[in-house]
Amino acid sequence: MKFIKKLILSLAFIAGISLGASSAKAACSTHLGDFDWDSANIHTAIATFIIEKGYGCDVEVTKGSTTPIMAAFFDGQIDVITELWEDNLVELLKPHFADGSIIHMGTNTPASEQAFWVDRATAEAHGLKSVEDMKKPGVWELFKDPENPSKGRMTSCISGWTCYTINYVKLKEYGLDELYTNFDP
C-alpha cells in the first residue's frame, strides 16, 4: 500500500510538472527575424536554441532580406532581431530608439565596420591611405574589372542589400563612379 501511494504521488507530481511546462511553453513565445547573411543566421540559431531549450518557449523564425524583415519589426510582427547593420538604417532607427519602441541590447561584433578595404601590401606599395587616393592616376588599373576592363572593380554588397545602394551612392559622391564599377558579388 505504501508503494502504491508513493507511485501515485510520484505520477501526480510528474503530471503536474508536465502540465506546468506545457502551460508555460504555451504562454511564452517569441518571433525572431533572421536575415540573409551567415552571421545573422548563426546569432538567430543560438538565440532560438537558448529561448527554446533554456526557457521552454516557442520560437517562430521568419527569414528574409532587410527591407521586409525590418518592416515587420517596425510593425511589431517580429519581436527580436539578433543582428543588424545599424549604419544601413540610421535614419529609420533613430525615432524608434528615441521613443523606446526598439531597444539596443548590445553589439555582437564590435570590430565590424562597413568601408572600402584594400589589403595592406597593395595600400603600402601604392600609397593608398584614404578613399581619395583611389582617384590617383593608374590606381584603378590595380583593381581592373574583367567584365569592364576600362574601369577598376569595387566589390560591393549583394544587390538588394542596403549596403549595395550605399556603396553605389558613395562611389558617385566620392567621384569614383567614373573609375570603378560597383561590383555585385
Short names for language-model regions:
Residues 101-154:
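A conserved helix-loop-strand patch within extracytoplasmic ligand-binding domains
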Residues 8-18:
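Bacterial N-terminal signal peptides
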Residues 1-6:
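Positively charged n-region of N-terminal signal peptides that target proteins for export
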Residues 44, 64-100:
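Pocket-flanking alpha-helical
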Residues 37-38, 58-72, 180-185:
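Short helix-initiation/N-cap motifs at beta->coil->alpha
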Residues 19-26:
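Sec/Tat signal peptide C-region and signal peptidase I cleavage site
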Residues 47-55, 133, 138-181:
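Ligand-binding cleft/hinge of the Venus flytrap
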Residues 26-39, 57-62, 150-155:
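Short, well-ordered beta-strand elements
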